[in-house]
């Protein structure tokens, strides 16, 4: 399945720089001890911008929910249909979610509740993205 190549902006650059090093980092608020994704100018909870830093997390989570896209007419960049769309809840902070098509997991075979791990996939020479795969 073809993947979009992300273009980092000043706010997301630390995230994508870490992905290129095969690491997962998230913004962390020192004021309320919360992780957040996607990156924002201020904490989603306490609205502090001064206390935001980047924190490495272990990249483990669980599948919270899943659907199968069978006819994504509006999404022509995903020609391989049907495909999974799973919501992954991060173990390090259950309030942080990611979305993934779970490469390697066939449509309709997503084990909701299963453990997943972040994986890094090369989508162009020298260009990595983060994905989630069901843990072995």
Annotated model-derived regions:
Residues 37, 51-53:
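Short functional micro-motifs and their immediate structural scaffolds
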Residues 60-62, 115:
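Residue-level marker of beta-strand positions
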Residues 1-26, 133-135:
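A broadly conserved sequence feature marking short terminus-proximal activation segments
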Residues 93, 98-136:
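Well-ordered alpha/beta subsegment
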Residues 63-103:
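Glycine-rich active-site loops that engage anionic ligands at enzyme catalytic sites
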Residues 22-25, 39, 57-59:
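Short metal-coordination and nucleic-acid-contact micro-motifs, chiefly zinc-binding Cys/His arrays
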Residues 27-30, 41-44, 111:
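Cys/His-enriched microdomains
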Residues 33, 47:
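Cys/His-coordinated zinc-binding microdomains
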């Amino acid at each position: 399945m073809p993947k979009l190549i992300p273009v980092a902006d000043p706010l997301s650059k630390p995230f994508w720089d870490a992905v290129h090093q095969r690491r997962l980092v998230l913004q962390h608020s020192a004021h309320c001890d919360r992780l957040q994704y996607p990156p924002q100018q201020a904490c989603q909870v306490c609205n502090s911008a001064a206390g935001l830093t980047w924190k490495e997390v272990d990249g483990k989570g669980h599948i919270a929910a899943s659907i199968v896209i069978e006819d994504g007419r509006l999404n022509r960049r995903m020609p391989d249909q049907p495909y999974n769309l799973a919501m992954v809840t991060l173990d390090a902070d259950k309030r942080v979610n990611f979305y993934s098509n779970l490469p390697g997991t066939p449509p309709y075979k997503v084990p909701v509740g299963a453990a997943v791990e972040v994986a890094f996939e090369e989508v162009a020479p020298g260009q990595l993205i983060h994905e989630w795969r069901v843990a072995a």
